[in-house]
Amino acid sequence: MESDMKSSYYLIFISLLLLAGCSSHGDASAQSQSNGMAVAKAAFDSAQYEKAERLYLALLSSDASLEEAQLMLARTRYQQDKKQAARDGLQQLLDRAGKQAPEAANYLGKFLLDDGRTEQAATAYRQGLALPELTPLARARLSNGLGVASLRQGAFAKGRALFEAAVAAAPDEPDYRGNLALGWLMEGNRIAARQAFEPLLHYQSLPPQVEMNYALLLLAEGNEPQARLILSRFLSASQLEHDIRLLKAQLRGLSV
């Protein structure tokens, strides 16, 4: 009996060792994976895109289920002008509807907009917005993206409504509020555009695109000197004159 008990204790002890060993191996593997992701991200952030691609591919060869690595691989490929491969990778992530699907929808929509594929971008954003359990910030990003696509398609009221949803979820995000002001302006409502933009005037600095949206609002209000001052920080003299003429022509069709 005593021998049987000793044998049982021995088996339990061995089992615990095996469990501890598996846990230790799992921890080491997770740490190695985390370190690999950090090194790859550092390469991406320093614009070493070929190196970053190799590192992400190596990570995925060890674990093909790493969605964050798949997302970053697509972003890395887009930066190397491997645009179709990047879009395909993002679409696959989006279709699987996993944890990285909202980010995949966001980048896929953005890349398609950058390439002038507005209808496809709108489809990507809509697919992202249909995902279950979106966080408020993810919903705001996707609503903003779909709003931009809507403006480009001439659906100003729809775009403005989407920007309102984005601002409601993230009221301190200057891009969303700047786009909301632009949406109101495209609908011809300068007063609402000014009200939407007003909170941003207290910010110490704004993204360039938001400042350019403000310059457009100033032009609509008849404040061309101030609009020129803002635009001159981003455009050459010849570009400035060309864009001022173009913007003024576009604004002639707008009314309060």
Predicted regions and their residues:
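Bacterial Sec signal peptide processing site at the extreme N-terminus
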Residues: 22-39
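Helix-start (N-cap) detector for alpha-helical repeat units in TPR-like alpha-solenoids
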Residues: 32-33, 67-68, 100-103, 136-140, ...
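Canonical tetratricopeptide repeat
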Residues: 72, 106-107, 141-145, 179, ...
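Terminal, low-structured helical/coil segments at or just beyond the last alpha-helical repeat
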Residues: 203-256
